[in-house]
Amino acid sequence: MVESVSEQLKDAALRLSEACNRGRNRILKHKSVAYVTNPLDYAWGFHEQFIDNWSGFGAKTLLLGMNPGPYGMAQTGVPFGATAMARDILHIEHRDIETPSGAHPKRPIEGLSMERQEVSGTRFWSILADHYGSTETIFSNIYVVNHCPLLILGETGRNVTPVDLPKSTIEPVLKACDRHLKSVVDIMGIETVIGVGNYAKKRAEAVLNDVHIDSMWHPSPASPLANRNGGADWRANAISKIP
C-alpha cells in the first residue's frame, strides 16, 4: 500500500531529524556556537500537525527557508512559525512542550504561548493569507519547508545561520538537509522551488534538477530590502514570485 503524501513527508522529516541530531555535536564544537536544538524533536507534535493539515492540497510550488529563528519555528515547529500565525492562520493546536536540554537560558521554549512574535514569520504568513484569502487556498498553491531544522545560537543568544559556519562543521548536516529537500520535491511532485533569500535558492540549485528555481527577498527585519518603503517593496516582491 502506498503511503499518503503526509505520511511520506513525516517519514522524511524524522529521518532528517535523526541525521541532524547526529551532526549536532560537531556544530557545538565550533567557537561561535554555544547552543543547538532541534524543533523536529521537541516540537514534533506541532510539526506533525503542520504536515497532516496542509501537505495534501496539491501544491506544486515550494517556498524554501533557511533555518529556524528563536521566536518562530523554534517555538512552534513550523517554518516562519510566529506563534500568532501558527495559531490563527495555520490552526496549530496546543501541545505540551518543554524547553529541551541544551537550550539557551535566554531563549526559553514556550511553544504557542510565546508572546514575542517573530517579525519574519509575521510578514511571511500575513502576505500569504492576504494574497490567497484562506489557508486552504494558500496550500493549494504553495508548501513551505526550512532547509535546515536546527536552531543554532551563540553564547549571547545571537542566531547563527548555516552560512556563518565553515563547511567542515556544517556539511554533514547540510547533506542530510539536501536529501530531505529532494525527498520533499519528489514526494509532492514539486515543479517550482522559491528560495526565501539567496542562500536557500543556492542550496536548491546545488541539488535539484528538472524543477524551476527562483528566489524572493527574505522578510527578516535585518534585511534592508525587507524594510524598504515600510515593507511595501518586500510585499510586492513576494507577490510577484508566488503563483
Please give the residue ranges for each predicted region.
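Active-site metal-binding loops of divalent metal-dependent hydrolases
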Residues: N67, N198, P219
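Short hydrophobic/aromatic-enriched beta-strand-loop microsegments
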Residues: V211-H218
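A polyanion-binding, active-site-adjacent surface
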Residues: E3-T192, K201-K202, V207, P224, ...
